[in-house]
Amino acid sequence: MAALLPELINGYSVKAFNMNSPLVQALLRGNTLTDHVLVIVQLSGGNDGLNMVIPVADYSKYYNARTNIAIPENAVLPIAGVTGTGLHPAMTGLQSLFSEGKANVVQAVGYPQPNFSHFRATDIWMSASNSRQEVFSGWAGRYLDYEYPNYPVGYPNSDMPDPLAIQIGGLTSLTLQGPTRNMGMSITNPTSFYNLISGTNDYAPNTRAGKELTYVRNINKQTQGYATVIRAAANAVTVQSPYPTGNSLADQLKIVARLIKGGLKTRVYMVSFGGFDTHSMQVNTDKVTGSHATLLGRVSAAIKAFQDDIKFLGVEDRVLGMTFSEFGRRVKSNSSTGTDHGAAAPLFLFGKYVEAGMLGVNPTIPANALVNDNVPMQYDFRSIYATILEKWFCLDKSVVQSLFPPDINTQLQVLPLLKPGACNGVTPPPPPVTNTDLLVTNFPNPFTSRTTVQFTTAGGHTLLQIFDTLGRLITVLTNQEYTAGTYRIDFDSEGLPAGLYYARFQNGITQQVRAMMKVR
């Protein structure tokens, strides 16, 4: 854990990180010629994706699984260009962004062997590790370390006078942790930040707090340079478009927009918004309002205001945003009008260069959902990161792969999330897969002990995995290069309990999930 200096310096809290901590240290580094910015919005607590992005085409199954919290079908907001799927009625702001061609929802994002602990699952998402691997650096931190390999020596400088990453409020997270040092700084109010690092010349006692104070002083000269440019950037912007009041996420995003317009070259901004651990009282009696509706409404309004503001400020060409939460919720609601920790869930991308619409299909919902049923993964979250690194930050594919653990990088997809022009060579969207385009099937289905899984590949790297309803990876049937064609592989379920299983097929930028039922 990052160690904080508990005292206040001249009345201001200064956050310094113990240099021996696995989460520690200071700022960032530049190579690739791009002025692009990524804004990461963390939804803390585990957001209920099924009540945020609602599978209207499978409404009867959705309703049967969630009778006490299901959003009324006639209240679901349609999404421009998408059929059979809608948004929670509180998300009118995001609905407008879809209509403007500036929002995308990626369905069922997750990873094999999901972890249901808030802390561990958050670490997995921030580090891009696998479920059973501890990685003490963040995916964005490793990217920044690649771009600025000599930091902190010689920074700030004329080429990069600004912080490489900024987190608004709280601690700098694992996301921004580089291999040896933290690549981000945390600020609360940019107009007063200059004051936060001044007046630190009192005697430092020989205590843990005193050592932290000495560390603050050691980085003071460097931080002083960043404080100056942050203050100048904030003061350079005097007019912004309106933001909702009483909305802490909107307050954070307003600062981000101000700093971007003010001229900072900062590559990554991170903001957070909590309260999504909705085990109980998620909805009111009308199902449309309640604690979850309030959260989603604030997220939607904040992102819409931010997007309007960066357009007003003339910087929207440079900015891409994404949301994430450490996990989704179970398919079936609980008896407390809430939902319990689950696996895969949708996430949003927003910005002028987003390929608007929906990537993926509605999640598979069992006709008679059980308490342990989870949304099966369609997209690995690390493929979202890889796409951003290659198609937004313009990195070579080999560099992107080097930023992920070796057992993951060969399975990364570059997804059709961004419009051509963000970087050269953006992958065009694949042709839509209809219900009749079954790329993966199995027979017999239901089956007792063995079933044959048939898949049709367009050629190239092909992955076929089997998951259970908890999202655990049971086996990998194949993970290799193929020539185009149709192939069959037997799946032997000997020793596995009866129940629902999912075959996940991945080929290039295409994937499908097939539900398979084992009976006694």
Give the label of every model feature segment.
Residues 266-268, 316, 324, 342-345, ...:
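Active-site lining segments that contact anionic ligands and/or coordinate catalytic metals
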Residues 45, 280, 329, 448, ...:
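Short, glycine/acidic-enriched loop or turn micro-motifs at the edges of active sites
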Residues 1-301, 305-313, 332, 346-423:
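Feature for exported/extracytoplasmic and membrane-associated proteins, marking the mature portion
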Residues 432-443, 447-520:
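C-terminal outer-membrane/trafficking sorting elements
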Residues 309-317, 321-340, 348:
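Hydrophobic alpha-helical bundle architecture
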Residues 420-434:
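Low-complexity, Pro/Thr/Ser/Gly/Ala-rich linker/spacer regions in secreted
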